[in-house]
A protein has these predicted regions:
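Loop/turn elements at helix/coil->beta-strand transitions in domains of secreted/extracellular proteins
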Residues: 25-27, 54-58, 165-168, 195-200
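Short alpha-helix in the alpha/beta-hydrolase fold that links the catalytic acid
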Residues: 43, 167-169, 181-191
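Primarily recognizes the serine-hydrolase "nucleophile elbow" in alpha/beta-hydrolase
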Residues: 14-84
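Alpha/beta-hydrolase active-site loop
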Residues: 1-20
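Accessory cap/linker subdomain of secreted extracellular hydrolases
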Residues: 62-162
Length: 246
């Protein structure tokens, strides 16, 4: 959820400066993947107003959930989609009074949804192991009504990533991502370019949503190199000029 996530990131950076013994520089680059990538985009958009004392040197968003509506719509086609759906339902029902379990979650499934929402996708194969641990051989059908309609649909749309970020931006996308789809991400990037955003965009062919950030992914080395360049104050390439044609 955009605004509170951005505020939490910036508050955490402020708090880190107060840690005794911490040797932090005066430059900050925000990283995030998936929903964290969406939070990184929101952080970049709100930083100037919310935390003018913390100028950002860059924002890195890997497979960001830039379009929550499209993300929710894709969940039925993804292994472990029920887990990602549970993350969304738990978050939105906790923040918005008009989004309720009763309206959107099938009767009898609520305990499973609440359990799934507390699990962390921390390593390869964890999606299947989580479902197995709950005695589920397949993804449970969670939604009682269309999650892209009504109050939840409205709230999802409100949390689409902003059209501009106040810092240099790197977006990385897995070419084989079935959750955050490459075509949807490309459309988002084109919108950013049209709004005048300065960015670099990299597609990693053969990488899915989680493999994009697993050990051995070329995206990891690229993120470190890009971040080091921002810390060094190097100019940013204008990736909008070099976007491959559709």
């Amino acid at each position: 959820i955009g605004v509170p996530s951005a505020h939490a990131v910036l508050d955490a950076r402020r708090a880190a400066s107060e840690l005794s013994g911490a040797r932090l520089g005066d430059r900050t680059v925000v990283w995030g993947h998936s929903q964290g990538g969406g939070a990184a985009l929101w952080t970049g958009a709100l930083a100037d107003d919310y935390a003018p004392d913390l100028p950002l040197s860059g924002v890195v968003a890997l497979a960001p959930a830039s379009d929550p509506l499209a993300l929710i719509d894709a969940l039925t086609e993804v292994t472990g989609g029920s887990i990602f759906a549970s993350f969304a339902v738990a978050a939105y029902t906790s923040i918005y009074d008009d989004v309720t379990f009763r309206e959107y979650v099938r009767p009898g499934v609520e305990p499973i949804v609440r359990t799934l929402s507390r699990r962390c996708l921390s390593e390869p194969g964890v999606v299947v192991s989580i479902l197995t641990s709950l005695g589920l051989s397949t993804d449970p059908e969670i939604f009682a009504s269309d999650p892209t309609a009504g109050p939840l649909g409205t709230r999802l749309e409100q949390n689409a990533a902003p059209a501009t970020v106040s810092a240099p931006l790197l977006i990385g996308q897995g070419g084989d991502d079935t959750l955050v789809r490459p075509d949807a991400q490309r459309a988002f990037v084109e919108g950013l370019c049209a709004s005048g955003q300065r960015l670099e965009y990299a597609v990693y062919e053969g990488r899915g949503h989680i493999p994009l950030v697993e050990r051995g992914s070329p995206a990891i080395a690229d993120v470190f190199a890009w971040t080091a360049a921002r810390f060094a104050g190097e100019p940013v390439d204008d990736g909008c000029r070099s976007l491959p044609q559709r």
